[in-house]
């Protein structure tokens, strides 16, 4: 992808990058391991973002 992106697309990509984090360790420990993943995890090659 080009280095020069429109601002809107750049903001959307940054938001998607921040959302795509694992569940924190304190949350896994607090729920005794019942919560290990969250449903919004996205792999960059399998799922495309909306344009």
Curated annotation (Swiss-Prot):
Looking up Pfam families in the UniProt record yields:
Ribosomal_L39 (PF00832)
Instruction: Output compositional bias ranges, type Basic residues.
Output: 33-51
> Is the keyword Transferase in the record?
no
| PROSITE patterns recorded | RIBOSOMAL_L39E
Q: Where is this region: Disordered?
A: 32-51
Q: Name one GO biological process term.
A: translation
Top-rank taxon of the source lineage equals Archaea
Question: Keywords, A to Z?
Answer: Ribonucleoprotein, Ribosomal protein
Quote the InterPro entries the UniProt record gives. Ribosomal_eL39, Ribosomal_eL39_CS, Ribosomal_eL39_dom_sf
Q: Which Gene3D superfamilies match?
A: Ribosomal protein L39e
Q: Please name the GO terms that the record assigns under molecular function.
A: structural constituent of ribosome
Cellular component terms per the entry's GO annotation: ribonucleoprotein complex; ribosome
HAMAP family with a match to the protein in the record = Ribosomal_eL39 (MF_00629)
Query: NCBIfam families from the xrefs?
Result: PRK01242.1
The Swiss-Prot or TrEMBL record describes its family as follows: Belongs to the eukaryotic ribosomal protein eL39 family.
Q: What protein name is recorded for this chain?
A: Large ribosomal subunit protein eL39
Q: Which gene encodes it?
A: rpl39e
